[in-house]
């Protein structure tokens, strides 16, 4: 509600309401608002804004303003001057409005703020206490405890928790409190405290009821705290209590106002007990009448809502009944009926205290017999117990209500001496006991009822029950249990219990096989006796136990086993010396039964531990073997029951057996799920003595895994052996399964373990990183030279021809990633050694991703490397000096320990060193670079000349030369080049192989001179010729073909590849070319030998040299020497070779990219001789294995050859057709002969028929899948630029094999037709065009997967393009309408627009050619409606035809429509339209083909040519010929094809018009 605005008469009103300081304070919404002048006089603008907000109607705004005000008061010392008298006057008025808000938060905040002001201002606020204290105390009387309790607590704190001061408030402000109550009760109502414009009637009533209920409670507390309140303020009290506003709260019609109702009941009670009502009869009469009337409001509909208040009503009536011996009942003539009806309804839902209150009312009214004992009270009690029996005992507070009922009912029954009452009580007791609800847990009720009858009575009833008919026992559910509970509770019951025990034993002995099924209570009763302290039963129990082995049967085992287990844990067992014998006898019998072992072992587990141990030692039972056998075959199908509690048969031996059983049966998950129930000792044994941790941790579900780790960690903290084992398992799994998704799990566990067991850090963090690296990387894979920046320099260190173990490499990478992530969590453990290790492994990732068939870019995600960490000196000059002279340690890039380290580690570290130098060289000036060159020259010279130089020294030299080769100081570089070249002159082959090849490797690094002059020669010509002679000598030696020469051969290939790029060298003569070509020819020949060392590198080096030589030949115009043909033959042979070490990786990609470039540079004629071989290899997977790049290369070449050969075949075919046409009329036989020679290859068709992928692309082998699509791509290549006749042959061939529809079905099944997001990202060219080598020979599954998806779309597009109307036939025959709709949506969105655009582009490109020859012809294209219109202007009239391309073309055929005709007959016009349509639907022609036929027919028609008398067209739709056959009789002309068709269909050669014979030669 809003407090805005000022009442017009407010300023003239002298009544201050609740105010005492000159301003009116009121609870209503229209009066008592702060004067604007007062608000404007507030000290600060902040306070003005707060009060302005408090006058708003929005409750959220008020709440925020109160919070701001509270903050100001909290900082009272800073803002004390804000809170002056003007502020308090304004607040006193606003406060009265806020406490009636519907928002409890606002009410509570306003009370808290006022109390804060009282506490902070102290004496300064004293004159305002009369305004504030009544409202505060009203807040403590709210029925909503979330407001009243905090308010009372705040008030108590304000007065230092002094109860005397709080009580004094009620006396000191008695008058003001009564005035407040009077204001609320007498002056205010629903209409005054709520503005009807903004509040509904229900909201207004609820608000007023809440306020007046608080006022009533305030009045009650006023009476409680002030004994003289009625004397000092009698007039005010009378006004308040005479007003009906309070008594209107005695209304229970809707059942929503019970709190206010009960508050008024308390008021009546206080007024009566304090003597106020007896002295004010009018008020008492008014209250009682309202009270009695309210009894009629209670009905069966609202009883559940009002039942909590019923005891208060009854207790009040009982209290008021004391007034003048029941005079209150005379205040209402129908009071008796109202009370009886009230009791009748209220007994249906009694609450705690109800029956006590009923009995209190009965006790107070029985002296004047307000209600008759037998006619009214007795039926009430009887119906109440019946209702309770029907309702059941499981409801809330049912035990308390039941006990309360029987306590009062039994007291009520004692007032009668009549026998019928006693019988009724007995009957109702037994009815309650047999109502189907168990009373065994209701202790107080049992005590109440057990004393009603002697124990013998209960015992006889039990025996009678068991001897009664089964039907009766079924009806009386829980009856015997209730009787038994009362018997054992009743006093002096020993003899009765003894008789009952004998009775039960007799029942068992009489029918041992059926007794427990027949009598449910026998088993529970016997167990109760065994668990009790009834020592007097010892003899009987012992005797019974001794008999059990003779009584037990397989069907009753569970019951007797339960009794025996209970007995073993009871006091009676220790009192019986022969008890153990009885147990042995029992289990001997039990083991003879065909019972599951879990059942018998469950019984043993329940036995007393000492007794169990005695049984285990028994030779007659052999329990150890029994348990061992059980463990071996345990199935974990009992939710781990055997683990629960203190399991007796689990020990260090059996738990191991159980674990091995779980592993053998694949039930480790189930085993782990129940480990939390296992004893710690056994769990430790499991962890230490088995491989459980490595087998289970991270191999089970996430939840189970986390629980397993927590359990293991807890034990690890106290056991270093377990801690180390846990650490090793975490590390092992991180090495195998570490990934960004699993990173957090491994790291979190490692950190928790290190924090709990610090010693385990040495397992995670390597003490000797180089040793760890060497363990996983024992050798350098020679293939690294193909993918690393060091290239052939790799061979300066010892390399291995055998491929490295990629799994070990991957483990090392994952370990480093794990270590890197661990350092993020534990940054204090970062040091240079670990950073160096991680950096080296990060370099290793490059090799892994290039060599692996499944690269992972996420492996590059290292954080703690030299490049990111920043704790290592990366200054270029310092690093160069460090390389020349390694440091002893510190932050140097190269230290002695690294320089002396394992060669594999050193190799990858050198690559890191090279990268660091490469990254920093750009920041180095030329002067600095040239200044360092002298020391580099000295280092290289020393290394080359010193026989003791190591391989590592040479590799460091190579790195420095690669760097300084960029220097502009030519003299020093030339000097080094000359030095290295001189090392090669005149050396013997053995020296070369052993040592000097390293000089050649270093020299190669100085031959990369990208900006050299054209005539520049890197080595002096004389010296170069001397080197050539040495090389020639090496190549002529026998050693040249030995494995030891392999490295030299690679370096020589690299040498000539770089050297022959210089024009100056090429101009020196043919010696360099001849030598290069000879080396190349020999090397290519060696590529064909499987056991050639470094084969994959050799083949790539050969291609590099060939490419360089090819460029040299083209530039110089020189002819290739004698080796030319041999080289090309060997290059072609490379396509067919299967390399054993070949993998679908980056190495393969690089090679086949080069090979494709080389092969495609050759003339296609040179490959024609290989056509059949390529065809056979492509179709025979065994020849190329799983090498997808080889398949890709050969397939793309085959496609080119198919197109090339088809051009010649088409010409040959058409020539033969023409010859055949002129030779014979009936040419059908020879047709078949001609066609059989020009069909699609049968082997190719067989391939696409037999090798259809069985699974969806996502699950199919990607290489096999794309090969299948390539076969189809080859088939469709035959259609490229072919003739109409051959196209029809191909289509018919595919149709006969059923391949067209099958492929359509396959594609639409494989494509996710609803995955529109993917296809929206695909460019239209990727659908309309496809290049087999378009993916740059990427062999990876992800790339091939995406390529397959796009190729499926392209193949569908090509099929649509080439098979014409067969597309529509296939689509229309799809029976699954959902699939049909999905296909249509997909095609319409992604393929049809391309096909339609192609048709329009085709017409656009040739439109000028069509219209230029005929001015009367006009062609119009409408890209919006996808329509083509062609019109002829004839005598100012149009002859027009249209071609409508549907949105889902080609699923629906193009429609040819005759728009308007002129100058020809309708029959001829229709025939033209049909012929035009036939070109598209029958001949798979395009719109342009159809349009050309139509325009030519029109042109010829109006040029005077005669049409065919059969088809009415001038040009034949198929062969485009004029009518050339004439009937000699009627002279009509016919197309040869039309007439031939007529002859075949009619069976003779007569004219279709005149029927005369026509002699016809086709």
Curated annotation (Swiss-Prot):
Any GO CC annotation of this UniProt entry: nucleus
First-tier enzyme category under EC: transferase
Disruption phenotype: Formation of detergent-resistant aggregates and inclusions composed of stalled proteins: defects are caused by inability to ubiquitinate and degrade stalled proteins. CAT-tailed protein species tend to aggregate and sequester chaperones and can induce proteotoxic stress.
Main location: nucleus
A molecular-function term among this protein's GO annotations: zinc ion binding
Family the entry assigns: Belongs to the LTN1 family.
Protein name: E3 ubiquitin-protein ligase listerin
Species per Swiss-Prot/TrEMBL record: Saccharomyces cerevisiae (strain ATCC 204508 / S288c) (Baker's yeast)
Gene: RKR1
